[in-house]
Amino acid sequence: VAELKSREQDIDELNQQIVQYAAMSLTHDANLQSGEYVKIASDLERLGDHATNIMERLLLIHDSKHDLSEEALEELATMSRLALEILDQLKETVGDNLEEVNNQEQLIDQAYETFERMQIQRLKSKVCGTSNSVHFAKILTDFERLGDHCLNIAQEMNTIHPSWKFVEQQD
């Protein structure tokens, strides 16, 4: 917990430094590129925010007297795995990996929608209570937004380096 909070502070400080550096760019092309770096820095900072939110909500669930169902725990494990995979893909974003980030983000969106529906069904059938359902739903949302920010970063990197291959997100 302390390590995650420390890293979040580091990310916030780096974000501020990147924005300051990008604002100092002089040429028109450099200004366009620095704008993309500012967007990337902002998305990276948001990744840290969502990771912190997930940690805090998991601690609230852990500290409560009500556990999540086995299914809900498995769903959170799946979302965690998907999030780690997209982060790994983002770290190695070159060439065709940009398309992989897009595909992974779509998997996260699909899992989010499925798991949200399943949680509603569990609530309706009283398999689980409302105590931690709100936290569960917010954790799902944080994972989904984490995927969105990873895709944003990949797209912004593609703008900076257009020679990289990337398939635009299909709606």
Residue ranges of each PLM-predicted region?
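Cytosolic, long alpha-helical scaffolding segments
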Residues: 1-171
